[in-house]
Amino acid sequence: MKKGILGKKHGMTQIFDEKGEVIPVTVIEAGPCVVVQKKTVEKDGYNAIQVGFGDVSEKKLNKPLLGHFKKAGVSPKRYLREFRLDDISGYEVGTEIKVDIFKPGDRVDVTGISKGKGFAGVIKRYGARRGPMSHGSKYHRRVGSMGATTDPGRTFKGKKMPGRMGSDRVTIQNLEVVKVDPELNLLVVKGSVPGPKGSLLIIRDSVKSK
């Protein structure tokens, strides 16, 4: 059965395996989450569970959201996300989802919002080559050609140009679960994941794992 959980990024560190080789890892506080709503094919057109994570004061929520949580009989949560599943019979509203749904050796996909870098040029944003730095060159780091002349007489959509960099939804696929700590709700995965410390992460079964 497919699995999913919400978490919060704690940061990166390194651990050693049985051979003494160092492994760069990311520590994630995963769960506990609670099922707030079930969606079915008959009523909603698809099967899914809505999951809440992170407690929040009632003062910070509007009336529709407060009513949503009261109907489910759960305390208000900061984050709400959906997981589409083929079979939701194992979940009921109020069911708690903990980090122990995963075990070492599992493969997961981690989704988050990447760090924002602000307005950036094409060299930083896309790795473009700079222009000549001497001999009378009038451009160094700016964009080169943006297209042809009279025909087509415009710059095509998708042309790589300066703009805001980062703050994108990014998914890192097929990360290995190195360690699971049910007591502290910690999930340790090999490699890096998107976003700054404290940012929301969505952890799912990997679509590439067999």
Curated annotation (Swiss-Prot):
Keyword annotations of the record: Ribonucleoprotein, Ribosomal protein, RNA-binding, rRNA-binding
Disordered, as annotated region: 131-165
One BP term from GO: translation
PROSITE patterns assigned to the protein according to its UniProt record, in alphabetical order: RIBOSOMAL_L3 (PS00474)
Gene3D superfamilies: 3.30.160.810, Translation factors
A Gene Ontology cellular-component term: cytosolic large ribosomal subunit
Function: One of the primary rRNA binding proteins, it binds directly near the 3'-end of the 23S rRNA, where it nucleates assembly of the 50S subunit.
Cross-referenced Pfam families: Ribosomal_L3 (PF00297)
Record bears the keyword Cell membrane: no
Disulfide bond entries: none
Xref: InterPro entries: Ribosomal_uL3, Ribosomal_uL3_bac/org-type, Ribosomal_uL3_CS, Transl_B-barrel_sf
Name listed for the protein in its UniProt record: Large ribosomal subunit protein uL3
UniProt key word RNA-binding: yes
Gene expressing this chain: rplC
GO MF terms held by the record: rRNA binding; structural constituent of ribosome
Subunit and interaction comment: Part of the 50S ribosomal subunit. Forms a cluster with proteins L14 and L19.
Similarity-based family: Belongs to the universal ribosomal protein uL3 family.
PANTHER family on file: 50S RIBOSOMAL PROTEIN L3, LARGE RIBOSOMAL SUBUNIT PROTEIN UL3C
The species this protein was found in: Caldanaerobacter subterraneus subsp. tengcongensis (strain DSM 15242 / JCM 11007 / NBRC 100824 / MB4) (Thermoanaerobacter tengcongensis)
